[in-house]
Amino acid sequence: PVLLAAWLSFSMSEVRGLTKSKSINGEYITIREVVVDVGKETKRKDMGKTPTRNRRHRIPPYIKELIDKVDGDVLVPISGRALYHRWIKLQDENGMAHITFHDLRHLSASIMALLRIPDKYAQERGGWKSDKVMKKVYMQTFSEEREKVDNIIDSYFEKIVEPEEDG
């Protein structure tokens, strides 16, 4: 779940809505549903907050390997509360200062800025609809340029999750 948020800029409700049957198509993952907790009830919805949130990303090979290891259809079959507590525990076990799960989307945006990903592509990847959050996407992106952007971001994260061995 953490890599889906930090690497692909998915929110907790988007991560919880991912399924192998509806979200995965070949080497792409698409936000088709979200899962939210309303009181004590869990609700699966066909759409995120806005149409721009229903977006598609190429699945980085490292994340694809993790997805392939998941039993069943639902990629993250736990409640929002359980996910939150596991995230806090992971931070504690690794001596990290606490950040919220949502902060991982901010991290994703910051990493894209650090890598000098054009705002237009960063906004598309993050699913932000207005320039008050990022910048508006009015023009279509070119798939060749988008592929270059995806390669830059994938390369950055792959170096983190698969560090080169010394010697």
Question: What positions do the PLM features span?
Answer:
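Short, polar N-cap/turn motifs at the start of nucleic acid-interacting alpha helices
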Residues: 23-28, 117-137
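Short helix-to-turn junction characteristic of helix-turn-helix DNA-binding domains
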Residues: 1, 5, 112-113
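Active-site/catalytic core of tyrosine-dependent DNA strand-transfer enzymes
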Residues: 33, 58-97
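Short, charged phosphate-coordinating catalytic segments
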Residues: 3-33, 120
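Active-site-proximal segment of tyrosine recombinases
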Residues: 14-16, 99-100, 109, 116-128
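Catalytic-site neighborhood detector that most strongly recognizes the C-terminal catalytic loop/helix
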Residues: 35, 64, 126-151
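C-terminal secondary-structure termini that scaffold catalytic or DNA-interacting sites
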Residues: 39, 44-62, 151-167
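Short, cationic motifs built from Arg/Lys/His that form the positively charged side of catalytic pockets
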Residues: 10-13, 55, 105
